[in-house]
């Protein structure tokens, strides 16, 4: 690697969207981005699942994208969340991301309406043909109730500007099948912190990470260790972060990550937006233990 991380490889943070008094907290968001870059994060992914995109208005979505791109100022790549289960809406969000100057977009499989594999293909094909910007597919069947089959991913990989996938199926067998079926330059990023290291072992190129919100240095170092072939160090870091990885999803995400960032003083208020709710006292106690284990508090 020559010490330089290739574009769209490594530890990308699925960054939270801070709120205060019910509005986007721009100052906390800027502070969080600076915290990320100072601690080695390789890229920023705003307006994804962890960014509570489902409860952002279109104007807020653009506000967050614009602020992320302006704050990053070219220091690391920005992959903007631009997905929707309405293909026309996904095209609008993708056009907005391109206008804002995003390096790429992340587009989730259509959720709730449960399309066939052909429907999934046509959805992503329509977006790719409408907006000329590098595009990552996003497979997260635990949330969307549809799985992008490896054969469909391979078919979509034949479209020029579809350059990779965030694979959050949680199944190494499927991830292996995707890597095996797709061209060598197709970028497979883990969508789960737990599978981030093993995904790189089998040919993945990085992760879009939740734990990176609170421990960016650890995830970035683990990714760099895998690319350097230092598997002992990568494994050590994986298990060092293990308890915190569990706590990030001990309550519905991103509530634990937001509370942790509040406790660390990185953001002013760690409340998610309804229908997400703050973590309870038991989860808070466990979160604090995991944070102390990483010397975060």
From Swiss-Prot:
It is an enzyme of class 4 (lyase). Pathway: Amino-acid biosynthesis; L-lysine biosynthesis via DAP pathway; (S)-tetrahydrodipicolinate from L-aspartate: step 3/4. It is found in: Cytoplasm. One of its GO terms (biological process) is diaminopimelate biosynthetic process. Its EC number is 4.3.3.7. Pyruvate binds at residues 50, 208. One of its GO terms (molecular function) is 4-hydroxy-tetrahydrodipicolinate synthase activity. SMART domains: DHDPS. Catalyzes the condensation of (S)-aspartate-beta-semialdehyde [(S)-ASA] and pyruvate to 4-hydroxy-tetrahydrodipicolinate (HTPA). This is 4-hydroxy-tetrahydrodipicolinate synthase. It comes from Desulfotalea psychrophila (strain LSv54 / DSM 12343).
